């Protein structure tokens, strides 16, 4: 008698050689196309990040360059600080180049390769996927047919074994039962014999089909291997290509290996190391400290042709280039190293006027003693000029006027070298305002 039939013995494996399990290899072709799309999306997102970072650097550099130029920092340290803004602009350009390389080179390279490697069909899907599917199906078809016969033969054999075991159990139990007649006993014995014959027949058929499957297996394996290797070659091209693309992306992203990037920071370091504290201190001493020239008081003859000899001359701007001060015995020229700021902050302008308007009535333009060279111009409307505001202006300091576009006020003096004028609002408030914010009426 054969061994007992056990349905659990029918194990389903996940092997490539099982019928239909080649579909994972076929699916890999479709996955390859999708992965190309994923890589392009990945590159696009990184390019957006590079673009945004480059713009942020540019905006940061512009804002802080203006703040530094208008601020109180001076000399070589100012130039060193400003070099950071130059670094930001140059690095911004490099990140723009990274963005352009990612989009114009790397992404386009993947897109073109994908287009050449995968060919869409009118009915959907890719030509390469269909060729692989057809190749595997053709190689597996004869073997799959044999496997179907084998499964049927095995099932018949196992069923016959099950019937044989059941018949033998009944026949053995009947021997102990008094109610079973000899005729019934004989039928049970015949049933056992018949089941044994069925087991033998199904076993022979099962073994024969199994032998046939064994004979076709080598040919089946050869055909499947051939199609699989074709898929492997296609996948190898994709893997090698994407590796090359990733290396290109790395090369574009790695600014540390970019000679221009290295040069930017070499220049920045040189600019910072060029800052000289002693030089800056000497400059400040000569332009804003004890080293400045001075018109020391001395006896002056009265000259009827010069009615305002007692009035002090206006000081030059703090950082104006080529500022010259002269005295009675000679002229001494002091040149600023900071350069023309273009737009002077209220800090600088306030410093200049704080020294101009002293409490000495002989030099105070607000003084009321006419013997000192003239009357206070703020007290005489006839000496003022009516002007109209072109733009809104909000005073940033206590000595500045505030007005709206269209407001009228009185101009009480000429524009100074820093672009400010003295004026009076109709409310009587006196102060300073930007000269180019108004027009004569």
Curated annotation (Swiss-Prot):
Cell location: Cytoplasm; Cell projection; Synapse, Synaptosome; Cell projection, Ruffle membrane
Membrane topology per record: Peripheral membrane protein
Known tissue expression: Highly expressed in brain (at protein level).
Record note on what altering residue 276 to A does: Reduces membrane tubulation
Residues carrying Phosphoserine: 2, 76, 343, 345-346, 358, 362, 402, 427
Coiled coil ranges: 23-272
Basic and acidic residues biased stretches: 311-321
Pfam families: FCH, SH3_9
GO MF terms held by the record: cytoskeletal protein binding; identical protein binding; phospholipid binding
PTM description: Phosphorylated by casein kinase 2 (CK2) and protein kinase C (PKC).
Phosphothreonine PTM positions: 181
Record PTM Phosphotyrosine, positions in chain: 391
Function: Binds to membranes via its F-BAR domain and mediates membrane tubulation. Plays a role in the reorganization of the microtubule cytoskeleton via its interaction with MAPT; this decreases microtubule stability and inhibits MAPT-induced microtubule polymerization. Plays a role in cellular transport processes by recruiting DNM1, DNM2 and DNM3 to membranes. Plays a role in the reorganization of the actin cytoskeleton and in neuron morphogenesis via its interaction with COBL and WASL, and by recruiting COBL to the cell cortex.
Subunit structure: Homodimer. May form heterooligomers with other PACSINs. Interacts with MAPT. Interacts with TRPV4. Interacts (via SH3 domain) with SYNJ1 and WASL. Interacts (via SH3 domain) with DNM1; the interaction is reduced by DNM1 phosphorylation. Interacts with DNM2 and DNM3. Interacts with both COBL and DBNL. Identified in a complex composed of COBL, PACSIN1 and WASL. Interacts with EHD1 and EHD3.
Protein name per its UniProtKB record: Protein kinase C and casein kinase substrate in neurons protein 1
Gene behind this protein: Pacsin1
């Amino acid at each position: 008698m054969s061994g007992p039939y056990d349905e659990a013995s029918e194990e389903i494996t996940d092997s490539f050689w099982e019928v239909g399990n080649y579909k994972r290899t076929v699916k890999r072709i479709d996955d390859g196309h999708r992965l190309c799309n994923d890589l392009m999306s990945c590159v696009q997102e990184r390019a957006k990040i590079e673009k945004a970072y480059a713009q942020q650097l540019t905006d940061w550099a512009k804002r802080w360059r203006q703040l530094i130029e208008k601020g109180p920092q001076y000399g070589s340290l100012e130039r060193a600080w400003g070099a950071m803004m130059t670094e930001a602009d140059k690095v911004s350009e490099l990140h723009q180049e990274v963005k352009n390389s990612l989009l114009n080179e790397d992404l386009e390279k993947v897109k073109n390769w994908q287009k050449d490697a995968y060919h869409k069909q009118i009915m959907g899907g890719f030509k390469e996927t269909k060729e692989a599917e057809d190749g595997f199906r053709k190689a597996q078809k004869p073997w799959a047919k044999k496997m179907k016969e084998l499964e049927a033969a095995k099932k018949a054999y196992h069923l016959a074994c099950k019937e044989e075991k059941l018949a033998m159990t009944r026949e053995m139990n009947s021997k102990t039962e008094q109610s079973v007649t000899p005729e019934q006993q004989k039928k049970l014995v015949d049933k056992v014999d018949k089941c044994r014959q069925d087991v033998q027949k199904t076993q022979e058929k099962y073994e024969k089909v199994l032998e046939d499957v064994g004979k076709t297996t080598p040919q089946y394996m050869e055909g499947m291997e051939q199609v699989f290797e074709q898929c492997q070659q296609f996948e190898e091209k994709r893997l090698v290509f994407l590796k090359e693309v990733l290396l290109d992306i790395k090369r574009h992203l790695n600014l540390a290996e970019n000679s221009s990037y290295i040069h930017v920071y070499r220049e920045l370091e040189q600019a910072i190391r060029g800052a000289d504290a002693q030089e800056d201190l000497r400059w400040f001493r000569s332009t804003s400290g004890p080293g400045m020239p001075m018109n020391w008081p001395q006896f002056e003859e009265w000259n009827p042709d010069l009615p305002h000899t007692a009035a002090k001359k206006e000081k030059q701007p703090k950082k104006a280039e080529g500022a010259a001060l002269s005295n009675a015995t000679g002229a001494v020229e002091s040149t600023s190293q900071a350069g023309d700021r273009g737009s002077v902050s209220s800090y600088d302008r306030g410093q200049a006027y704080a020294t101009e308007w002293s409490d000495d009535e002989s030099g105070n333009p607000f003084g009321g003693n006419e013997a000192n060279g003239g009357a206070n111009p703020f007290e005489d409307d006839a000496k003022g000029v009516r002007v109209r505001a072109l733009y809104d202006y909000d005073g940033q300091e206590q000595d500045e006027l505030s007005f709206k576009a269209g407001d009228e006020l009185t101009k009480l003096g000429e524009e100074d070298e820093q672009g400010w004028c003295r004026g009076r609002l109709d409310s009587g408030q006196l102060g300073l305002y930007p000269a180019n914010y108004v027009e004569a009426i």
